[in-house]
């Protein structure tokens, strides 16, 4: 039988990849001034994300619940994330006098939609099944430690918001894996993408956090694991409101991710991390390099089956060359851990040390 598709891939996928020359990458692009390149690269990134929600006219922050914790207070809040969306979130505020450094926490995907922000901040006054769901997830991927609470105990204001389709921003009828492709298709039909929408929400979340009177807007960072890691380095590229970013278990190249055997070829969840047209100009490490010379951290696992080590190493080399070109090698941290797709406590401690170095006075 004749065919031109095998698995989920066209048989000519290699030729398609060969035509991607990433002409806007630093060093390939015509710009020789790095700041001029950054402006053009970021503008192109924004063009690929058009038809985004307007910024909110006012945040309209309300605190709806509070819980005292050891060294900090957990607050359940609602605020206007954009002109279209009023969202619930968790905000952790350390005891003492601010202004404090602050971190936007970006949750993972995991094809697990019942919780979002609760994957990173311990929920409170919730149904027992939500508490159990969160505890089990944190045990499975975060070494039984809520990363947000860990950072708050160490003096950081922490904000965690659900991405669209997760937690309290979910689907009325209940979310499932297959819903993603239809939701993503509908975004595409309206000239934008689900991924772009998530990124703009993250930008607005950061701007909101930086606006709070007890936050030092010069010391705002972002952190995520898995899809949250992708969101984190994208956020570092998209906005100067982020002063430092850390990304755990999401960095690679199109060469190694677009293969017949890599998880990304399944579609579905991949739509949440897709900005159409962007690959014609920039590969993943090129986009991440828009953040240079800001302090930026990447951790990956040698045993992580989702991200081939050769692709991680290629991406690291690319970014290292960019930071080095700007005399900022000391501001880029790249490390492959002897670990699976997992954010262990030692890694969390290393991320805290990174933020302490760059975001604390």
Per-segment meaning from a language model:
Residues 1-73, 81, 116, 359-361:
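N-terminal targeting or regulatory segments adjacent to alpha/beta-hydrolase or S9 domains
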Residues 66-126:
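Glycine-rich active-site/cofactor-binding loop and its immediate structural neighborhood
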Residues 98, 106-200, 210-211, 256-259:
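Cap/lid segment of the alpha/beta-hydrolase catalytic domain
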Residues 182, 186-190, 197, 204, ...:
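Mobile cap/lid helix-loop segments that gate and shape the active-site cleft of serine hydrolases
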Residues 214-226:
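Alpha/beta-hydrolase fold nucleophile elbow
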Residues 224-234:
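Glycine-rich nucleophile elbow surrounding the catalytic serine of serine-hydrolase chemistry
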Residues 291, 298-300:
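Short beta-strand/loop motif that positions the catalytic acidic residue
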Residues 317-361:
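C-terminal catalytic histidine-bearing segment of alpha/beta-hydrolase fold enzymes
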